[in-house]
Amino acid sequence: MLTRQDYIENILDHYDNPRNKRELNPNDIQASGGNPGCGDIVVMFARLDEDGRIADASFSGEGCTISQAAASMLTEELVGKTLEDVGRMTFEDVVEDLGKDVVSTRTRCATLALTIMKSASEKYTREHRH
Protein backbone atom coordinates (compact mmCIF):
# COMPACT_ATOMS: atom_id res chain seq x y z
CA MET A 1 0.00 0.00 0.00
CA LEU A 2 1.35 3.38 -0.96
CA THR A 3 1.66 6.06 1.68
CA ARG A 4 0.52 9.64 1.30
CA GLN A 5 4.17 10.60 0.82
CA ASP A 6 4.54 8.02 -1.99
CA TYR A 7 1.60 9.58 -3.84
CA ILE A 8 3.01 13.08 -3.37
CA GLU A 9 6.42 11.99 -4.65
CA ASN A 10 4.81 10.34 -7.70
CA ILE A 11 2.83 13.51 -8.48
CA LEU A 12 5.95 15.66 -8.13
CA ASP A 13 7.94 13.28 -10.33
CA HIS A 14 5.34 13.52 -13.11
CA TYR A 15 5.20 17.30 -12.73
CA ASP A 16 8.99 17.78 -12.72
CA ASN A 17 9.64 15.11 -15.38
CA PRO A 18 6.45 14.98 -17.43
CA ARG A 19 5.99 11.99 -19.68
CA ASN A 20 4.86 12.65 -23.24
CA LYS A 21 4.61 16.43 -22.87
CA ARG A 22 4.74 17.43 -26.52
CA GLU A 23 2.44 18.23 -29.40
CA LEU A 24 1.75 15.02 -31.28
CA ASN A 25 1.66 15.52 -35.05
CA PRO A 26 0.13 13.93 -36.95
CA ASN A 27 -2.70 13.06 -34.61
CA ASP A 28 -6.22 11.71 -34.84
CA ILE A 29 -7.43 13.40 -31.69
CA GLN A 30 -6.59 16.85 -30.39
CA ALA A 31 -8.74 18.51 -27.76
CA SER A 32 -8.25 21.14 -25.11
CA GLY A 33 -9.88 22.26 -21.94
CA GLY A 34 -9.23 24.26 -18.85
CA ASN A 35 -10.04 24.91 -15.26
CA PRO A 36 -10.55 28.65 -14.79
CA GLY A 37 -10.47 28.35 -11.01
CA CYS A 38 -6.88 27.17 -11.05
CA GLY A 39 -5.66 28.50 -14.40
CA ASP A 40 -5.08 25.01 -15.79
CA ILE A 41 -4.92 24.51 -19.55
CA VAL A 42 -4.46 21.04 -21.01
CA VAL A 43 -4.37 19.92 -24.63
CA MET A 44 -4.59 16.16 -25.16
CA PHE A 45 -3.35 14.41 -28.32
CA ALA A 46 -3.73 10.83 -29.52
CA ARG A 47 -2.83 8.86 -32.62
CA LEU A 48 -4.70 5.65 -33.41
CA ASP A 49 -3.32 2.54 -35.07
CA GLU A 50 -5.11 0.57 -37.80
CA ASP A 51 -6.96 -1.45 -35.15
CA GLY A 52 -8.35 1.66 -33.48
CA ARG A 53 -6.07 1.45 -30.47
CA ILE A 54 -4.16 4.44 -29.15
CA ALA A 55 -0.64 4.06 -30.52
CA ASP A 56 0.69 7.28 -29.02
CA ALA A 57 -0.64 9.90 -26.62
CA SER A 58 0.71 13.20 -25.42
CA PHE A 59 -0.30 16.47 -23.83
CA SER A 60 0.69 20.09 -23.67
CA GLY A 61 -0.39 22.90 -21.42
CA GLU A 62 0.30 24.56 -18.14
CA GLY A 63 -1.22 24.75 -14.75
CA CYS A 64 -1.04 23.41 -11.25
CA THR A 65 1.04 20.44 -10.22
CA ILE A 66 -1.94 18.11 -9.99
CA SER A 67 -3.43 18.85 -13.43
CA GLN A 68 -0.10 18.51 -15.18
CA ALA A 69 0.93 15.36 -13.30
CA ALA A 70 -2.47 13.79 -13.99
CA ALA A 71 -2.12 14.53 -17.72
CA SER A 72 1.36 12.99 -17.73
CA MET A 73 0.13 9.86 -15.94
CA LEU A 74 -2.88 9.57 -18.25
CA THR A 75 -0.75 9.58 -21.41
CA GLU A 76 1.06 6.50 -20.12
CA GLU A 77 -2.22 4.72 -19.38
CA LEU A 78 -3.82 5.50 -22.74
CA VAL A 79 -1.38 3.66 -25.01
CA GLY A 80 -2.89 0.38 -26.17
CA LYS A 81 -6.45 1.29 -25.19
CA THR A 82 -9.38 1.61 -27.58
CA LEU A 83 -11.60 4.68 -27.50
CA GLU A 84 -14.24 2.46 -25.90
CA ASP A 85 -11.73 1.66 -23.14
CA VAL A 86 -11.21 5.39 -22.63
CA GLY A 87 -14.96 5.81 -22.31
CA ARG A 88 -14.98 3.24 -19.51
CA MET A 89 -12.17 4.90 -17.55
CA THR A 90 -13.49 6.49 -14.38
CA PHE A 91 -12.64 9.64 -12.54
CA GLU A 92 -12.43 7.55 -9.39
CA ASP A 93 -9.57 5.57 -10.95
CA VAL A 94 -7.67 8.79 -11.67
CA VAL A 95 -8.20 10.07 -8.15
CA GLU A 96 -7.05 6.71 -6.74
CA ASP A 97 -3.92 6.75 -8.93
CA LEU A 98 -3.03 10.23 -7.68
CA GLY A 99 -3.87 9.44 -4.05
CA LYS A 100 -7.40 10.11 -2.89
CA ASP A 101 -6.48 12.01 0.26
CA VAL A 102 -3.84 14.04 -1.62
CA VAL A 103 -6.19 15.34 -4.33
CA SER A 104 -9.57 15.19 -2.60
CA THR A 105 -9.92 18.98 -2.61
CA ARG A 106 -8.59 19.27 -6.17
CA THR A 107 -10.67 16.76 -8.11
CA ARG A 108 -11.33 19.16 -11.01
CA CYS A 109 -7.58 19.53 -11.49
CA ALA A 110 -7.03 15.79 -11.11
CA THR A 111 -9.71 14.80 -13.64
CA LEU A 112 -9.24 17.56 -16.24
CA ALA A 113 -7.10 15.51 -18.66
CA LEU A 114 -9.45 12.51 -18.51
CA THR A 115 -12.50 14.76 -18.96
CA ILE A 116 -10.93 16.18 -22.12
CA MET A 117 -9.89 12.77 -23.45
CA LYS A 118 -13.26 11.13 -22.78
CA SER A 119 -15.09 13.95 -24.55
CA ALA A 120 -12.68 13.90 -27.51
CA SER A 121 -12.94 10.10 -27.79
CA GLU A 122 -16.74 10.26 -27.86
CA LYS A 123 -16.63 12.99 -30.52
CA TYR A 124 -14.15 11.04 -32.66
CA THR A 125 -16.28 7.89 -32.41
CA ARG A 126 -19.45 9.79 -33.42
CA GLU A 127 -17.72 11.42 -36.39
CA HIS A 128 -16.05 8.23 -37.67
CA ARG A 129 -18.87 5.69 -37.46
CA HIS A 130 -19.20 3.59 -40.56
Protein language model features and the residues they cover:
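C-terminal binding/interaction regions
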Residues: 1-25, 30-31, 55, 81-130
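Short solvent-exposed loop/turn micro-motifs enriched in small/polar/acidic residues
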Residues: 26, 39-40
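Short beta-strand elements
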Residues: 40-50
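Alpha-helical support elements that line or immediately flank enzyme active sites
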Residues: 70-81
